[in-house]
Amino acid sequence: NCLSELVEDCGGKIDMTRLPIGDKTLSAKEIIANESQERMGLLIDEQHLDHVKRIAERERAPMYVVGQTTGDAHFSFVQGDGVKPFDLDVAQMFGHSPKTVMTDVTVEHHYEGVTYTTNKLDSYLKDVLQLEAVACKDWLTNKVDRSVTGKVARQQTQGEIQLPLSDCGVVALDYRGKKGIATALGHAPQAGMADAAAGSVLSVAESLTNIVWAPIATDQAHPCAIENINLSANWMWPCRSQKGEDTRLYNAVQALSDFCCDLGLNVPTGKDSLSLSQQYPDGKKVIAPGTVIVTSGAEVSDIRKVISPVMVNDKNSSLYYIDFSFDKQRLGGSVFAQMLGKIGSDVPTVKNPEYFADCFNAIQELIQKGWIMAGHDISAGGLITALLEMTFANTTGGMHVNLHDIMQDDDDIVKMLFAENPGVVIQVSDRRKKDVKKFFEDNGIGYTKIAYPTPDKCLITVVKDDFKHDFDIDTLRDTWYKTSFLLDRRQSMNGMAQKRYTNYKKQPLDIHFNPSFKGTLESYGLDAGRWKKEDGISTKRPCAAIIREKGTNGDREMAYTLWLAGFNVKDVTMTDLISGRETLEEVNMIVFCGG
């Protein structure tokens, strides 16, 4: 598949004796069709081949010249004995393939709804917070370097305790500018089981309510922020595994297409894995739930304005709830239902795409105005989870929540707390109270003031009419973290996971700078571009070499740092030293980066 697409326009011949084969027992069919990962096919002009080979050798990247273009519109694999186990006209492969007609029927699935009582709120919340979709991802984020490139403007962990709570990731475009790129994810597998169309819409909605916290760059042709976002859809589906699955996929794709068209969004790329089922010799079949994972990406106008989900412990501020869905609060397809062993059939969706876009653009405008102090999306786990997560990364403080003004047909506290209708919670200073009220009213956006911070209490107190309940933040933080500990325990040794679980909240970030420190070159009388000036100073610069090996990272930002400090910087690989291409004779300092 990889090599054939490279020569689609001209044809080509692959010499199978030149392919790196690790298992000599593989048949020709297995060699041609295997899906070994971490490989890349390149089509290179013959005159540049030696240059590319030298680069590959320097970087220790295994490179194999396995074939050539032919110009005869045929694509073939040739064995050492001259036999061609594969030889087709490229037109047969790409140009004239017949359309696949898939016939299916609609199969109605009705899943039992949930029954519950407000007397078990603590038990419900404890179980919801431990489900993997909601629980802490510390076990995962601790396994990656979150600073490589030196351009990471928004990484996973947030707040004093540095918990993985970020809604989106943001990377700067360069070391000195304000622009960047944001990305976020969304998926709704449980909702997709109950209603494939609603699951697709919720996946898109979650991805957008995650990326909304980064100020999206706009232009004259696309003045609304939401129009400047691109999506990627990864379809994970058990096609042809049972009656009705292909129909569900069709409905899901149609719903996503319609929703994105209504929002003015582009989905230029994606991926699919449409055979997610496994049948065993005894006839048993395991079928994965069909879902779509939506990735959103956009240019960021100012990486310094990205909103954090961590609540600011300012008693003179308020938290506002904004519902993007324009739908009734429903528990079908929610984590709450899953926690009770149910799925439910009453699934929320986005009733009015135009209103959703208006809400998104309104939040973007508030970010540009600088009015939002903190913000978080409402998705897995519902409103109560979003509010708790806004407090988890703090060592002190809580909030008082009043649900009285949330519009609903009934006074169902459980729905208010656990429904996963797309929406957001924002924190705004009380001095902007009148401004925010006028802004939302002028833009036709419904909003509800639901909470205010309580800096002296580590509780979330929820009230509605005669109902009142306290949730202990410290206890629930440990509950939320427990799943991460249990997963990490399987992957680490010597009780390190237990130590992490015991101490993670006892080491908050507490950074103190000298009063004179401003974090700018200007404050030291320095100009970042001073080395470009033609004043002869560049000839006096000492030389530093960054020694790297395959797997080294962090070398690019180190090179920039050294250059900024006044060094000429050389990139030196171990192969340079071994081959004698580099002797380090003119080097004054060497640096080894991690990897």
Annotate each predicted stretch with a short phrase.
Residues 46-177, 189-192, 216-218, 249-251, ...:
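Intein/HINT protein-splicing elements and their conserved insertion hotspots or analogous self-processing inserts
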Residues 2-29, 393-404:
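Anionic-ligand anchoring segments at beta-strand to alpha-helix junctions in alpha/beta enzyme folds, i.e.
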Residues 193-278:
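A glycine-rich phosphate/pyrophosphate-binding beta-strand-loop-alpha-helix module
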Residues 6-13, 178, 390-397, 556-572:
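Short helix-loop-beta junction
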Residues 7-10, 33-45, 232, 237-269, ...:
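Glycine-rich and small/hydrophobic secondary-structure elements
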Residues 541-562:
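Glycine-rich phosphate/diphosphate-binding loop of Rossmann-like nucleotide-binding domains
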Residues 175-184, 220-229, 585-592:
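Short coil-to-beta-strand
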Residues 561-564, 569-595:
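Flexible gly/pro-rich beta->alpha loop and the following alpha-helix that scaffold active-site loops
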